Amino acid sequence: MKRALHVFLVGVVGLSLGLLAFSIVPTKNNAVSAKATAVALQPGEYTVGADINPGRYTVTPQNGSGNFYSDPKKSSGSSLNEVLGTGDPTYVPSVTANFKKGDKVKMEGIPSVQFTPVTKRNKNNTTMLGAGIWVVGKDIKKGKYQVTPGQGQSGNFTVEPKSMFGSSTNEILGDDTSAGQVPKINATLRKGDTIQIQGMSQVNFSKK
C-alpha cells in the first residue's frame, strides 16, 4: 500500500511540474514584438531590425533633398526609389511604407531623414494618396475609381492584386502623352490589393 501511494504521489508531482513548464513556454500569441519607433538617420545604408525597428513609417527629409532607397529581404516585397525633398516637381516630400526585418534602407545626399511611425490608417479614404505603398481596405476604400496625378506631376502608378486571378495595373500618370504618360486611368480596387505610387506627392481618386 505504501509503495502504491509513493508511486501515485510521484506521478502527481511530475504531472504538476509538466503542466507548469508547459504554461510558461512563450507562444506566438503572447510574445511581444518590437514596435515602430521614431528615428532620424544620416546618409548611409541601414538594416531594418538592427538600425530601425520593423514597422510602418512615413519617411521625410529633415532638410535638403536626395535619394532614398529600400530593398526588401524577400523577393516578393516591394522596393522604394524616391528623391525626397521639396521645390522640384520630381521630388516627393515624404514616402510611406512598411519596413520589414532584414530589409535594407539607403539614403544619399540628404543630411538627415526622419522615420515617423504611422499610428493610424484611413480605411474610409476615397480621395487622395501620396508616394508610398498602400493597401486597399486599410488606406483607401475598395471600389471603382478614376485616378489622376496631382497638378503638374507625373510618375508610376501600380496595383498588384491580392488574388492571383485579379488584374494588375502599371501606368505612368502625367500630361506628356508623347512620353507614354496617361492623364487618367479607371481602376477597380479590391480589398487587399497593393497600390504603389512613385515620383508623385499626390494622386487623386474619384469614386465612380
Feature names for model-found ranges:
Residues 6, 23-56:
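N-terminal, intrinsically disordered, polar/charged segments of Gram-positive cell-envelope systems
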